[in-house]
């Protein structure tokens, strides 16, 4: 008599899983549907590249252990995990309804969003279930860290579950749960990120999820997060410097928002308060008047799932291709290729498979870097001189006549013969470097001028800022604010030749912030 498959433990053997369509991809991983033969069940497998993270295996195991102990109807069930080559595979329950983001995209594509994407009862029903899941996580000392429509999944019965909890977000932070350290890169878009997470001054708590929840509420009504049109550094700057966003932020056609009432808007504003202590808890939000409009899962099944895209419609089939990388590759037509060790390229079978199945690959820069954790920013070729010539330091209370000079200009490169230059190299020459000077006080309260160049198209604001921090010239806590203001200048150098901004590192002791004397402030200018 054969053993009941449901009683079997989940396999940690890669060969027991038949990988199928790609159902999601992002900066940190690829999610594929798969069939587990021993269990006779379809699952979702999230494949995360371990080479790209800075997390020890001990820390990973602790986080996986926490995930395995989470049992709640509004949290996606975690089954098991194991390592395949340089990837961590997380095996989870497959929810065939897809994500709420899939639903949003489907509605927008059909042009059915002119009076708002989802109506209030639908939003209330989905978000009430999300809050139930968040309340459970928060009570158990967990922070989700990535609440958004793309991580809210729907079952075919109308059930709502939060996905992407735990290891994937943990990996994205390099295992630094409280973010007391400085992250080297931002993974993905910061559109849903709370201000206190961006600032990286202190650790953050579960109230960061409440901010993301408020942004998600806007996303469900308008179809996108408020600052979705802007590049990441601009989003950081707008979030930190502007008043909190509202339902209207970034929406051109205000007519689409008319049907949303006061209780919905009030609920959003409660979540989007810059002071995390003023935000309600998940339990408090569940008692908010807006959630009286919530219905049951049968309502979602009828209202949403019957007109939602099927799993095959929203997925990309994977073509099997001989090779040795053991990785997925995105092709120019938007499909995916899986390269593994199954075929010998020298064999007749291998050559036949290559000729039939191989598609044109996207450029090297778009292959694995698109699928897995964001790589370190491209170097900016900034060189820190071994000896820094500095003038006499000035006391904090006085404006110096000549601040200390720090040169970060790149060394001159030998000229190439004209005939040896390619058209690509010639086009790079048209990118004129912008010479900048960052004036701020060092740890001894002495005023320094840090001179450097930024080449559009080659450098990134975050990459340059990170180099300034690595060189010990800028406090690590000021990464975000320096990068955001650098981005502001290089985007519009004609109108933003000089900006003065408050530093996240603040002032020490009895010092009083002063933007004129640059105490607790910095000035970035085009020189």
Curated annotation (Swiss-Prot):
ATP binds at residues 23-31, 46. Effector serine/threonine-protein kinase component of the WNK-SPAK/OSR1 kinase cascade, which is involved in various processes, such as ion transport, response to hypertonic stress and blood pressure. Specifically recognizes and binds proteins with a RFXV motif. Acts downstream of WNK kinases (WNK1, WNK2, WNK3 or WNK4): following activation by WNK kinases, catalyzes phosphorylation of ion cotransporters, such as SLC12A1/NKCC2, SLC12A2/NKCC1, SLC12A3/NCC, SLC12A5/KCC2 or SLC12A6/KCC3, regulating their activity. This is Serine/threonine-protein kinase OSR1. Keywords: Acetylation, ATP-binding, Cytoplasm, Kinase, Magnesium, Metal-binding, Nucleotide-binding, Phosphoprotein, Serine/threonine-protein kinase, Transferase. Its cofactor is Mg(2+). Belongs to the protein kinase superfamily. STE Ser/Thr protein kinase family. STE20 subfamily. It comes from Mus musculus (Mouse). Phosphorylation at Thr-185 by WNK kinases (WNK1, WNK2, WNK3 or WNK4) is required for activation. Autophosphorylated; promoting its activity. It holds the Pfam family Pkinase. The modification N-acetylserine is found at residue 2. Activated following phosphorylation at Thr-185 by WNK kinases (WNK1, WNK2, WNK3 or WNK4).
């Amino acid at each position: 008599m054969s053993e009941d498959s449901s009683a079997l433990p989940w396999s940690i053997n890669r060969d027991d899983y038949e990988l199928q369509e790609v159902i999601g991809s992002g900066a940190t991983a690829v999610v594929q549907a798969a069939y587990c033969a021993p269990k006779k069940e379809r699952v979702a497998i999230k494949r995360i590249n371990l080479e790209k993270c800075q997390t020890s295996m001990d820390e990973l195991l602790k986080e996986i252990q926490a995930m395995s102990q989470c049992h709640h109807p509004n949290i996606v069930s975690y089954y098991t995990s194991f390592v395949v080559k340089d990837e961590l595979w997380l095996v989870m329950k497959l929810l065939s309804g897809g994500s709420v983001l899939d639903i949003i995209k489907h509605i927008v594509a059909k042009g059915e969003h002119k009076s708002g994407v989802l109506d209030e009862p639908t939003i209330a029903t989905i978000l009430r279930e999300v809050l139930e899941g968040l309340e459970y996580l928060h009570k158990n000392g967990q922070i989700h860290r990535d609440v958004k429509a793309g991580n809210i999944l729907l079952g075919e019965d109308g059930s709502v579950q939060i996905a992407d909890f735990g290891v994937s977000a943990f990996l994205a932070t390099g295992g630094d749960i409280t973010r007391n350290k400085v992250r080297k890169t931002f993974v993905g878009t910061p559109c849903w990120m709370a201000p206190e997470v961006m600032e990286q001054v202190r650790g953050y708590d579960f109230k960061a999820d409440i901010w993301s929840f408020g942004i998600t509420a806007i996303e469900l009504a308008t179809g996108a997060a408020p600052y979705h049109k802007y590049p990441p550094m601009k989003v950081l700057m707008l979030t930190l410097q502007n008043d909190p966003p509202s339902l209207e932020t970034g929406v051109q056609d205000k007519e689409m928002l008319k049907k949303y009432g006061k209780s919905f808007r009030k609920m959003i504003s409660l979540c989007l308060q810059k002071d995390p202590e003023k935000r309600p808890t998940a339990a408090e939000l569940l008692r908010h008047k807006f959630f009286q409009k919530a219905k049951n899962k049968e309502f979602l099944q009828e209202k949403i799932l019957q007109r939602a895209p099927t799993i095959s419609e929203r997925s990309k089939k994977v073509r099997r291709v001989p090779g040795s990388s053991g990785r997925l590759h995105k092709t120019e037509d938007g499909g995916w290729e899986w390269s593994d060790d199954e075929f010998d390229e020298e064999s007749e079978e291998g050559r036949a498979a290559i000729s039939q199945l191989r598609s044109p690959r996207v450029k090297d820069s778009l292959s694995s870097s698109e699928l897995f954790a964001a790589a370190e920013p491209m170097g900016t070729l900034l060189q820190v001189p071994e000896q820094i010539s500095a003038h006499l330091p000035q006391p904090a209370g006085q404006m110096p006549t000549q601040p200390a000079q720090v040169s970060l200009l790149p060394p001159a490169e030998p000229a190439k013969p004209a005939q040896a230059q390619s058209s690509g190299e010639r086009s790079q020459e048209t990118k004129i470097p912008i010479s900048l000077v960052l004036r701020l006080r060092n740890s001894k309260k002495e005023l320094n001028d840090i001179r450097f160049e930024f080449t559009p198209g080659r450098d990134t604001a975050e990459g340059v800022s990170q180099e300034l921090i690595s060189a010990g010239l800028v406090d690590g806590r000021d990464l975000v604010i320096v990068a955001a203001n650098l981005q502001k200048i290089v985007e519009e150098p004609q109108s933003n030749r000089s900006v003065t901004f408050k530093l996240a590192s603040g002032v020490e002791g009895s010092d009083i912030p002063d933007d004129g004397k640059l105490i607790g402030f910095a000035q970035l200018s085009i020189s």
